[in-house]
Amino acid sequence: MLRRARTAIGLAVTALVVALSAPAVQADTTAPTGPSSDRAGADSAVYVVQPRSDGTTYTAIYEPAPGVTADELRSTLRRQGVRGVQDENSALGIGIAGCSPIVGTATAWCGHKWAYGPFNDPQVYFLDHSGDSWPVTDARVDWYQAPGIDAYYRWHTAGCPGGGRHCVHVYSGNYGTAWYGLTEASTSGGYFVDGSVTVKLNDQVTPNTYAARRSVACHEMGHALGLDHNGSTNSCLSVPEFPQHPSSDDFAVLNQLYPKPGT
């Protein structure tokens, strides 16, 4: 989805999304400002937004498969019965895409961040359900090095450790030919809801090479930490060109999204 929204529209829409997802957890006192309108490159992703009666908001980011346009993916999702598929310039879709902090071509995913819990940095565990061809543990190494947030790996049978730690379930499978990867979550008050964040990696369209699968895993895991897309092909958060690692701009966004307490 192209970032063509004007700042005034973005600010109004961000307020609308926050109002629809009334806080059920701590209020986000460092919420991002409005959507970015000056990012390099085009974002062809498709966003889904579903405000819910319990005050949470379900959101998802789909990355179109090769040869599939964003409009074609939207049509496919709607035919499959997915509600809340956002058009390119729809208010709710613009309202969750590409917020500050913005560093270079990297941005945060508006209203999607982890609570600190009892720690100085949020603790996020990726629980791996994926097949052997997906190097989730290697991709996690990159995100563990990011400042501001600690990312850990666990095989799914070990379970979520609890105690204020957060978990993201990572799956792989044959999900059709319309998209590479999907990150979905529920939020409340600008924070991820524990137990709701899921990554899905598509065996059916992602080339079965280490580079391609590490890139897609890195991309979706970055969303699960609170990042939106990056306009530079030096980052795995870009439109898939199969770069395998985050960029320094991605790390800088996380460092600002999760400042040390008291700073």
Where in the sequence are the language-model features?
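Secretory targeting and sorting signals
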Residues: 1-30
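Zinc-dependent metalloendopeptidases
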Residues: 28-263
